């Protein structure tokens, strides 16, 4: 996410982007960024990814992968790290459910 003036409001970016990540075996996996947002309570940026080409299951659901986006000093890059707390998981679930309903 590019540099933002974070205030007390939830900031959401729905621009899709493709990212290449590596799985546990070191294989490249292509993901589509489906949602990106900053949450003022946690003071973190989050990205929600879906594996490119993933098919929905019998309940019409696609597995989403939430990550924390830790930007580097330049703001041009950074790293994605796993979600840290149950509170973050709950917040992410609420944001994703709200965004997917719209």
UniProtKB/Swiss-Prot annotation:
It holds the Pfam family DUF1292. InterPro entries: UPF0473. PANTHER family: UPF0473 PROTEIN CBO2561/CLC_2432, UPF0473 PROTEIN CBO2561_CLC_2432. Belongs to the UPF0473 family. This is UPF0473 protein SAOUHSC_01719. It comes from Staphylococcus aureus (strain NCTC 8325 / PS 47). The lineage of its organism: Bacteria, Bacillati, Bacillota, Bacilli, Bacillales.
